[in-house]
């Protein structure tokens, strides 16, 4: 099992555990520089990111805002901007957390796009949903929500000449816990390679309030299971996932779940197949 852990960690470019606050600050600096270089390479000056109220988008948003602020200071070009986007489906259960995230990030610009009408309009036109059991239909519509959010972010980025930031990190990547061509679609993923507790460490160091740093993670895509915790979907805890990624001991059953899920979701981490 240890060899499998090492192979998967290498494939996901998992970063080693932080040993000190200096390690955390080094990762923050590295990832801000990465964001800045992505903008320079693309010849663009705008970043777009959906803010959900969870620690992942909060952390990515804090990094993005710092990146453009530093670029403005370094270059004197005030055109560098970060647009934080709220993408609620009707009324979001944890909207207060989303608003607290926005207040923490203090993005250059905030936009809100309620995806409810678009999701409902599309669902009503899909004959494939007819006759499905409620749980299956709810799951499919949940993925529609994630993909409509992607469409909205890319529309804003296209209109404003920007790049879309993703929030994927190693603990989600290993479980394939994202919607293919939904929240998995982005131009840059500045949290890539980090375990979940490392994302929290970055958030904490960037000044995020503790209640948001330690908030129970939820994708919150299904109407029939609002606020359903990620860990309940995984069947393992983030602590166990992080331990697996860092080659540390964990329950045999938990390790088996992670490995099986990793292989089952491999298609999500690959480019489309071609002949």
UniProtKB/Swiss-Prot annotation:
GO molecular function: ATP binding; glutaminase activity; metal ion binding; NAD+ synthase (glutamine-hydrolyzing) activity; NAD+ synthase activity
Gene3D superfamilies the record matches: HUPs (3.40.50.620)
Binding residues annotated for ATP, in chain numbering: 50-57, 167, 196, 218
One GO process term, biological-process aspect: NAD biosynthetic process
EC identifiers of the protein: 6.3.1.5
Annotated metabolic or biological route of this protein: Cofactor biosynthesis; NAD(+) biosynthesis; NAD(+) from deamido-NAD(+) (ammonia route): step 1/1
Binding site for Mg(2+): 56, 172
Positions that bind deamido-NAD(+): 147, 180, 187, 267-268
InterPro entries cross-referenced by the UniProt entry: NAD/GMP_synthase, NAD_synthase, NH(3)-dep_NAD(+)_synth, Rossmann-like_a/b/a_fold
GO cellular component, as recorded: cytoplasm
Pfam families documented for this protein: NAD_synthase
Keywords per UniProt: ATP-binding, Ligase, Magnesium, Metal-binding, NAD, Nucleotide-binding
Reactions performed catalytically: deamido-NAD(+) + NH4(+) + ATP = AMP + diphosphate + NAD(+) + H(+)
Assembly and oligomerization: Homodimer.
Family per similarity comment: Belongs to the NAD synthetase family.
Role description: Catalyzes the ATP-dependent amidation of deamido-NAD to form NAD. Uses ammonia as a nitrogen source.
Protein name: NH(3)-dependent NAD(+) synthetase
Gene symbol of the encoding locus: nadE
């Amino acid at each position: 099992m240890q060899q499998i852990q090492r192979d998967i960690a290498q494939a996901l470019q998992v970063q080693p555990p932080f040993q000190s606050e200096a390690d955390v600050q080094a990762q923050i600096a590295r990832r801000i520089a990465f964001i800045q270089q992505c903008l320079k390479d693309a010849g663009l000056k705008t970043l777009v990111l959906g803010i959900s109220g969870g620690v992942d988008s909060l952390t990515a948003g804090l990094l993005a805002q710092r990146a453009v602020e530093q670029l403005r200071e370094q270059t004197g070009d005030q055109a560098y901007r970060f647009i934080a986007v709220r993408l609620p489906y009707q009324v979001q259960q944890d909207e207060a957390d989303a608003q607290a995230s926005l207040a923490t990030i203090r993005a250059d610009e905030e936009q809100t796009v309620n995806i409810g009408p678009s999701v409902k309009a599309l669902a009503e036109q899909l004959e494939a949903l007819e006759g499905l059991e409620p749980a299956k239909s709810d799951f499919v519509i949940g993925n529609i929500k994630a993909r409509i959010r992607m469409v909205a972010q890319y529309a804003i980025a296209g209109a404003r000449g920007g790049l879309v930031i993703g929030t994927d990190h190693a603990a989600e990547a290993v479980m394939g816990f994202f919607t293919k061509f939904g929240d998995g679609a982005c131009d840059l993923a500045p949290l890539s390679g980090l375990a979940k507790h490392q994302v929290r460490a970055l958030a904490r160091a960037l000044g995020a309030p503790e209640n948001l740093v330690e908030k129970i993670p939820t994708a919150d895509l299904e109407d029939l299971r609002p606020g359903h915790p990620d860990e309940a979907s995984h069947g393992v805890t983030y602590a166990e996932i992080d331990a697996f990624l860092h080659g540390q001991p964990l329950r045999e059953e938990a390790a088996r779940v992670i490995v099986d899920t990793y292989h089952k979701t491999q298609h999500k981490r690959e480019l489309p197949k071609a002949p």
